[in-house]
Amino acid sequence: MDDLVSVIIPYYKKRNFVKETVVSVLNQSYDSLEILIIYDDTNLNDLEFLQEISKLDNRIKIINNNKRLGAGLSRNKGIEQSNGKYIAFIDADDTWAPDKLKEQISFMKKNNYQI
């Protein structure tokens, strides 16, 4: 099995984009991953929306900050909750090319990067 990558997505008011973001991560050719969406908002409707998105795949987890912490602290919280050997960040309004993780992991292993 490939080494697990924890993909951390800080979420704040990106409802119109986040599903496309999650789908782009799920469509990675490197599939040993978990997705941690760090909910950094107070709108309960958005939290329910994210919970629906999490039903797309059992590798998706929603972590609720319960108060506004900002993107940096949300990323830190994601790291604390992660299980992966590797950490990757993507913003909730971004997408990845399908081979992004595969190429990054391959490059790091090939060049003996210390983890």
Protein language model regions, located:
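Nucleotide-sugar donor-binding/catalytic module of glycosyltransferases
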Residues: 1-115
